[in-house]
From Swiss-Prot:
The keyword ATP-binding is annotated on this UniProt entry: yes
Nucleotide-binding listed as a keyword: yes
InterPro entries linked: GHMP_kinase_C_sf (IPR036554), GHMP_kinase_N_dom (IPR006204), IspE (IPR004424), Ribosomal_Su5_D2-typ_SF (IPR020568), Ribsml_uS5_D2-typ_fold_subgr (IPR014721)
Pathway as given in its UniProt record: Isoprenoid biosynthesis; isopentenyl diphosphate biosynthesis via DXP pathway; isopentenyl diphosphate from 1-deoxy-D-xylulose 5-phosphate: step 3/6
Function comment: Catalyzes the phosphorylation of the position 2 hydroxy group of 4-diphosphocytidyl-2C-methyl-D-erythritol.
NCBIfam families, alphabetized: ispE (TIGR00154)
GO molecular function: 4-(cytidine 5'-diphospho)-2-C-methyl-D-erythritol kinase activity; ATP binding
Protein name: 4-diphosphocytidyl-2-C-methyl-D-erythritol kinase
Residues reported to bind ATP: 90-100
Catalyses which reaction(s): 4-CDP-2-C-methyl-D-erythritol + ATP = 4-CDP-2-C-methyl-D-erythritol 2-phosphate + ADP + H(+)
Stored Pfam families: GHMP_kinases_N
Organism: Chlamydia trachomatis serovar L2 (strain ATCC VR-902B / DSM 19102 / 434/Bu)
Active site: 8, 132
Domain of life of the source: Bacteria
Length: 288
C-alpha cells in the first residue's frame, strides 16, 4: 500500500506566552501542501524500515516506529510490517516531515489491518507522538492551539500558491523556543494572521535566514506576496493568491521569480475524511 506523507506550512504562528508546564502557548494556522514523502507499507516476516535519500533515519527512534508501537498497544495486532519511505521533506525544515510520517503510518496501519479506527481515535494516538502530528487527521486546514496539538478544523479552502525555499541546515524547534523573549510574543488582543513570532528568535540564531528573507523580498518586490518562515524553520516560503496566475503579466513575473530564486512551487491540499491525502496515483507510487 502506498501513501503520500504531505508536508505542512504554518501560515501564521503566534506565541501568547509561557505556560505553567514551561511550554509556550501558541495559536497557528496549519495547511497541508501537495509536496511530501512517499510511504509504502506491506505485511512482512519481520519489521523493517528503508528510507531512501535519508538512510540515517533508519533507526528505532524514527517516528514511524512510535506509531507502530502505539497502534500495536491499542489494537493488540503485532504482525510484522515493512516500511519504505522515499524522503523528500528535509529534516529540521519546519515542514513536519517526521510528524507527517507518523500520522501517515497510523492511517496506513489502520488500512492494511482493517481495524476501523476513527479519525478521533487516531488523532488521540497522534497526540502522544508530536505536537503537530494530530493536525494530519484534519481535512488539511486547521488551527492549532495550546501547544499546537489541539486542532480546530477549518472547512474553508484556500486558493493560494506557495514557493518553498529550503536550507541545507535545519533548525531544532526546541532551540528556537529556548531563545524566545517576552518581546517576541503577541498580545491575545492583537493577533496578526500572517505573522510568525518565531522569526525573530530564529533569525537571531540564523543570520543567513534573515538575509535570505531580505533577498527574497527584493526579488518578489513587484508582486503582492507574503514571505515568511514556516514553524521554526529553516524553510522560508512565498505565498500568493492563485488568481494572480490568470493575469499574463503577473504570471510571467511569477515564473521569472521562481526560476531566478530556485524555489519549489506547490499548492494547498485537502483530505477527504474517508481517505488520505493524495496527489499521486496508486500506479505512480508503486513505480517509485
Amino acid at each position: 500500500m502506498h501513501f503520500l506523507s504531505p508536508a505542512k506550512l504554518n501560515l501564521f504562528l503566534q506565541i501568547l506566552g509561557r505556560r505553567e508546564d514551561d511550554f509556550h502557548e501558541i495559536v497557528t494556522r496549519y495547511q497541508a501542501i501537495a509536496f511530501g514523502d512517499q510511504l509504502s507499507l506491506s505485511i512482512s516476516s519481520r519489521d523493517s524500515l528503508q528510507v531512501i535519500n535519508a538512510c540515517h533515519l533508519e533507526t528505532p527512534s524514527n517516528s514511524i516506529w512510535k506509531s507502530v508501537a502505539l497502534f500495536r498497544r491499542y489494537t493488540g495486532i503485532t504482525t510484522p510490517v515493512s516500511w519504505r519511505v522515499v524522503k523528500q521533506i528535509p529534516v529540521g525544515a519546519g515542514l513536519a516531515g517526521g510528524s507527517s510520517n507518523a500520522a501517515t503510518a497510523l492511517f496506513a496501519l489502520n488500512q492494511i489491518f482493517k481495524t476501523g479506527l476513527s479519525d478521533e481515535e487516531m488523532r488521540s494516538l497522534a497526540e502522544q507522538i508530536g505536537m503537530d502530528t494530530p493536525f494530519f487527521f484534519s481535512t488539511g486546514a486547521a488551527l492549532g492551539v495550546a501547544r499546537g496539538e489541539k486542532i480546530i478544523a477549518l472547512e474553508e479552502s484556500v486558493s493560494d500558491r506557495y514557493v518553498l525555499y529550503f536550507s541545507s541546515e535545519g533548525v531544532l524547534t526546541s532551540r528556537a523556543f529556548a531563545v524566545v523573549q517576552p518581546s517576541d510574543c503577541s498580545s491575545r488582543k492583537n493577533l496578526e494572521y500572517t505573522q510568525n513570532d518565531l522569526e525573530k528568535p530564529v533569525f537571531r540564531l540564523r543570520l543567513d535566514l534573515k538575509e535570505k528573507k531580505h533577498w527574497l523580498e527584493s526579488l518578489w518586490a513587484e508582486l503582492p506576496v507574503h514571505i515568511g518562515l514556516t514553524g521554526s524553520g529553516a524553510t522560508l516560503f512565498v505565498r500568493y493568491p492563485e488568481i494572480l496566475e490568470e493575469d499574463p503579466s503577473y504570471a510571467a513575473q511569477i515564473q521569472r521569480a521562481v526560476t531566478l530564486s530556485g524555489g519549489l512551487l506547490t499548492s494547498p491540499i485537502r483530505r477527504d475524511p474517508t481517505a488520505w491525502y493524495s496527489i499521486y496515483s496508486e500506479s505512480a507510487l508503486a513505480a517509485t
